[in-house]
């Protein structure tokens, strides 16, 4: 039995890595052929992209649909199937490496280059300053979440904390059985998606929590919406989808154990709220590109990419790498070395991708 589980875990992990590399190739191959100049550029001498080109807008709309459908499917999937813990644990670390590499090598580089073109006589590091601002803004959203949880903690029953055990994937129960008291006590301190929604004592608290939790997802979507080429849009899509889908799966697993009444409706409702945030950001980015052009569009792009850098770094470090998916029962593949390898692989994928992006 143990050997069979190990084989299945190994198969899932190999499939995950193959899918990641295939998606990378697809992101660049589908990003635009050499003859699709009407979508990626306006044909001017400077080679400036046409942000209102029909092909570019269509690609962004496809990205909107894919990230919404993928996140929603991931959120409700635990209701229909059982996910492998090793796949989720290492896959989340892989997504963290991808997020970190994308922020540092793609978004920050693009923002810095655009600011250099906009302000050639200024040496001030605007891109890096905005990255810090994005990091702090995301931390502020997390502080708002912590405030709501702390305010509602005194009004919730002690038993409510026993169901909370996810920190981007940390489970406090297995196969429907309650966890041990120490695990439940530790889970009470978690500020995770599922546990915080579970402890929200009023509808207003729940709405505020969902808004705060989806704050960075909206800016992630804006990174797709303001992309200058189809290749950039598809690349941002698969980067964001990795994080969103893994987080949605982990949230769905915890909700099934914490909310036994009408579990499918609970999973669908929370997954829908989590899934719709990034498409909202994509829509905002599309509207920005549709109403601006030239120098104004460059400023918006530079500021958006700078803020997105800080948000991606915060999500990578504080939500994916430091917390990740931690199953209650030990998993053979979930070791420090395994997690390091997954993170290095995620960063390496972006490093290789950037060879064709420079």
Curated annotation (Swiss-Prot):
Membrane-related topology note: Multi-pass membrane protein
Chain ranges on the Extracellular side, renumbered to this chain: 28-60, 108-127, 228-235, 289-296, 357-358
Pfam families, per the entry: Zip
Keywords assigned: Cell membrane, Glycoprotein, Ion transport, Membrane, Signal, Transmembrane, Transmembrane helix, Transport, Zinc, Zinc transport
Subcellular location as annotated: Cell membrane
GO cellular component: membrane; plasma membrane
Region (Disordered): 164-185
Signal peptide: 1-27
Transmembrane annotation, as ranges: 61-81, 87-107, 128-148, 207-227, 236-256, 268-288, 297-317, 336-356
Glycosylation sites: 112
InterPro entries: ZIP
Cytoplasmic membrane side: 82-86, 149-206, 257-267, 318-335
Any one Gene Ontology BP term: zinc ion transmembrane transport
GO molecular function per UniProt: zinc ion transmembrane transporter activity
Similarity section: Belongs to the ZIP transporter (TC 2.A.5) family.
Function, in words: Zinc transporter that may be involved in zinc uptake from the rhizosphere.
Name of the protein in question: Zinc transporter 2
Organism in which the protein naturally occurs: Oryza sativa subsp. japonica
Gene: ZIP2
């Amino acid at each position: 039995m143990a050997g069979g589980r190990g084989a299945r875990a190994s198969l899932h992990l190999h499939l995950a890595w193959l899918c990641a590399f295939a998606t990378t190739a697809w992101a660049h191959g589908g990003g635009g052929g050499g003859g699709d100049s009407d979508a990626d550029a306006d044909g001017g001498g400077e080679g400036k992209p046409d942000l209102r080109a029909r092909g570019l807008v269509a690609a962004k709309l496809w990205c909107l649909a894919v990230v919404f459908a993928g996140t929603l499917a991931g959120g409700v999937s635990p209701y229909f199937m059982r996910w492998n813990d090793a796949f989720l644990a290492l896959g989340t670390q892989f997504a963290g490496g991808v997020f970190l590499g994308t922020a540092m090598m793609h978004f920050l580089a693009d923002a810095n280059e655009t600011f250099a073109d906009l302000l050639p006589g200024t040496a001030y590091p605007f891109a890096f300053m905005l990255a810090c601002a994005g990091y702090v803004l995301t931390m502020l959203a997390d502080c708002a979440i912590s405030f709501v949880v702390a305010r509602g903690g005194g009004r919730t029953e002690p038993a409510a904390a026993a169901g909370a055990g996810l920190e981007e994937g940390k489970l406090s129960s297995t196969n429907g059985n309650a966890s041990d008291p120490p695990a439940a006590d530790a889970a009470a301190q978690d500020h995770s998606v599922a546990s915080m929604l579970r402890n929200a004592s009023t509808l207003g608290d729940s709405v505020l929590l969902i808004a705060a939790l989806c704050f960075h997802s909206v800016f992630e979507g804006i990174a797709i919406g303001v992309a200058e080429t189809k290749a950039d849009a598809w690349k941002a899509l698969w980067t964001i989808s990795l994080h969103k889908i893994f987080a949605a799966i982990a949230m769905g697993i915890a909700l099934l154990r914490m909310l036994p009444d009408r579990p499918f409706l609970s999973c669908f409702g929370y997954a829908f709220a989590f899934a719709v945030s990034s498409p909202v950001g994509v829509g905002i980015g599309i509207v920005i590109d549709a109403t601006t052009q030239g120098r104004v569009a460059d400023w918006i792009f530079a500021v958006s990419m700078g803020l997105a850098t800080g948000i991606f770094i915060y999500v990578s470090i504080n939500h994916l790498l430091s917390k990740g998916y931690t199953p209650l029962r030990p998993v053979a593949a979930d070791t420090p070395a395994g997690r390091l390898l997954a993170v290095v692989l995620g960063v390496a994928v972006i490093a290789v991708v950037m060879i064709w992006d420079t």
